[in-house]
Amino acid sequence: RLRFGERDGDYQDHIVPKRTPLRLQDVDLYVNGNPAAPAADGTIRVRQYDTLEYRMEVGGKWENPYDPDQVSLTANVTSASRTYSYPGFYMLDFQRQFHDSVETWAPQPTAKPWRIRLTADEPGPMRCQLRVVNGRKRKTVALPRIEVVAGNKRGFLRSSQTDPHYFQYDNGEGCFLIGHNLPIYNNIGKAPDTILQRMADNGENCCRIWMSSDSLGIEWEDRPGRYRQESAARLDHFMATTERLGINVMLCLDTHQDFVGQRWLDNPYNKVHGGFCKKPQDWFTRKAAQKQYRKRLRYLVARWGYATN
């Protein structure tokens, strides 16, 4: 069943080249999705394992904002015991809607589409410096100090330090995973919400889902390096829902089905679409394909690496 409706404002899911002076400005911090409230001394206090998201405007010159070779945003983070770099990303906002029990995602005007999304995983002082690199130009901005206080969240799920055959959370609590596959993100009814809720109600604490071309895969446009923002919005929702329900996610990044039959003919890595591969096997060996795939991995880490589950 098709449904047509009015569109609010201009929708630009395609890539729009940018031609402005280099700038990095209007930075806002959100903590667990809410605007941060600095203390009187300017310090922002958060709890351990809170999700921090910096939203900002970035200007410069590029053809594709998803290509870090053209423009890249990075946060240099100094916590109580270490210093590390964390990648940023470009995104477009979507709003989840339902029409006759069918889920749709409507594009929305996106204020401050450049983001840094990370988790405060260590108590103590935390400082972030943002850096944007655009060709030979670069700009840095130091951000207000953050104080991370200990909380009661379990933290990231990792291999157990006692027995690597099992899992444990950062707080030392063990975890035995019980769950099943959800290979396709279903947009009929309120799935995956209903399915995930039933799983949690019955004691399941993990699931596996695919980033395939007909589900949550983001790199499936007319050429490599163009990321489907509607699929990314669905994955944002999926990760938030599973985190709320205490369900850990095995995110399957690819499927062989996208490299056979009609799907290979549609695959953006196929040479007929400006890709790098004459045949599916080339995807594993061509240096250009490997380089492009690393860019996608960078985007995945930047957008969803914050998730403790």
Question: What is each residue range found by the language model?
Answer:
Residues T74-N76:
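Beta-strand signatures of extracellular beta-sandwich domains
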Residues P65-S72:
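Short coil-to-beta strand junction motifs in C2/discoidin
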Residues K18-I44:
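Short, compositionally biased P/S/T/A/G/V-rich stretches that sit at domain boundaries
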Residues R82-Y84, F89-Y166, Y185:
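Extended acidic/polar, glycine-enriched regions
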Residues S72, V133-G135, G151-N309:
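Active-site mouth of glycoside hydrolases
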Residues R47-T51:
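Solvent-exposed, conformationally flexible loop/turn segments
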Residues R1-H14:
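Extracellular beta-strand ligand-recognition surfaces/modules
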Residues Y54-P65:
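Short amphipathic, basic-aromatic surface patches that mediate peripheral association
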